[in-house]
UniProtKB/Swiss-Prot annotation:
Catalytic residues as annotated in Swiss-Prot or TrEMBL: E82, E113
Misc note: A lyase-type mechanism (elimination/hydration) is suggested for the cleavage of the lactyl ether bond of MurNAc 6-phosphate, with the formation of an alpha,beta-unsaturated aldehyde intermediate with (E)-stereochemistry, followed by the syn addition of water to give product.
Enzyme Commission numbers on file: 4.2.1.126
Span of domain SIS: 54-217
Gene behind the chain: murQ
CDD domains xrefs: SIS_Etherase (cd05007)
Protein name, as recorded: N-acetylmuramic acid 6-phosphate etherase
Pathway as given in its UniProt record: Amino-sugar metabolism; N-acetylmuramate degradation
UniProt catalytic activity: N-acetyl-D-muramate 6-phosphate + H2O = N-acetyl-D-glucosamine 6-phosphate + (R)-lactate
Superkingdom as given in the UniProt entry: Bacteria
Subunit structure of this chain's protein: Homodimer.
Organism: Bacillus anthracis
UniProt keyword terms in alphabetical order: Carbohydrate metabolism, Lyase
Physiological role: Specifically catalyzes the cleavage of the D-lactyl ether substituent of MurNAc 6-phosphate, producing GlcNAc 6-phosphate and D-lactate.
Length: 294
């Protein structure tokens, strides 16, 4: 029942939202947004458990799969598509599915979120297996598409987790791990693209970033697996080598090219004064962790 969900309640502070001037609306939104990070903080221990499971999946060559509808689905896809350029993953390692398919990313597909079987079809299409982790995302915590996906994931032995913005969410019953960030009433009643969406984005940022750190995609606080897909990222790659090694920009650029634009290898080459092949071998032995390779 929607009336029992805190995300559907009316916000007592914004009953006269339509009478506020623009500045008052913005101040109200900002005031409410300040509460989101605090709500996420209360769920850190649960988020940590999810990260550990995701790392285990990655170590076993499994995948992280997000499923959601509407804003929740879009946020999952957004997090997934940022992983290849940021962490050098292939596009299968982290994937996002939205009820109604990719066309639903830009235009609502009526009724798609109400069909459990659509999620099962989506997960079957990628050969979901016991090495994978499926995270169901739903602000309300009751979306049938997400429930169907979690049911199927459990049936094949995959790890499962849920992210919702209501306590005792329905989807929590179908996932082994639960993150329930209680964001409360929105300034615009029921518009969960606001605080609830912000909370989900923060949690997804945490899960993907911490998991990638856990499998060696980061050295110190540098994204050493960044893929140089444009000029900005080429420059960033060279700057990362400078920051990691302390050499001049020119020396960093030289090693970047010698390492065939592999930032990790370039760092190892500089710090260990070795050739590209040796750097690759050391990284392989260290399972991709730069610190261990050194």
């Amino acid at each position: 029942m929607l009336e029992n969900l805190s995300t559907e309640h009316r916000n007592e502070k914004t009953m006269n939202l339509d009478e506020m001037n623009i500045k008052e609306v913005l101040q109200s939104m900002n005031e409410e947004d300040r509460t989101v990070a605090l709500a996420v903080e209360k769920e850190i221990e649960h988020i940590e458990k999810v990260v550990r499971v995701v790392i285990q999946s990655f170590e076993e060559e499994g995948r992280l799969i997000y499923i959601g509808a509407g804003t929740s689905g879009r946020l999952g896809i957004l997090d997934a598509v940022e992983c290849p350029p940021t962490f050098g993953t292939d596009d299968k390692m982290v994937q996002g599915f939205i009820a109604g398919g990719l066309k639903a990313f830009t235009k609502a597909v009526e009724g798609a979120e109400d069909r459990e079987e659509l999620a099962e079809e989506d997960l079957k299409s990628i050969g979901l297996n016991e090495k994978d982790t499926v995270i169901g995302i739903a602000a309300s915590g009751r979306t049938p598409y997400v429930i169907g996906g979690l049911k199927y994931a459990n049936s094949v032995g995959a790890s499962t987790a849920s992210i919702s913005c209501n306590k005792n969410a329905e989807i929590s019953k179908y996932a082994k791990l639960n993150v329930e960030v209680e964001t409360g009433a929105e300034i615009l009643t029921g518009s969960t693209r606001l605080k609830a969406g912000t909370a989900q984005k923060l949690v997804l940022n945490m899960i993907s970033t911490a998991s990638m750190i856990g499998v060696g995609k980061v050295y110190k606080n540098l994204m050493v697996d960044v893929q140089s897909t444009n000029e900005k990222l080429v420059e960033r790659s060279k700057r990362i080598i400078v920051e990691a090694t302390g050499v001049s920009y020119e020396v960093a650029a030289e090693h970047y090219e010698k390492a065939e634009r592999n930032v990790k290898a370039a760092i190892v080459m500089v710090l260990l004064q070795c050739e590209y092949g040796e750097a690759l071998e050391k990284l392989k032995q260290a399972k991709g962790f730069v610190k261990k390779a050194l």
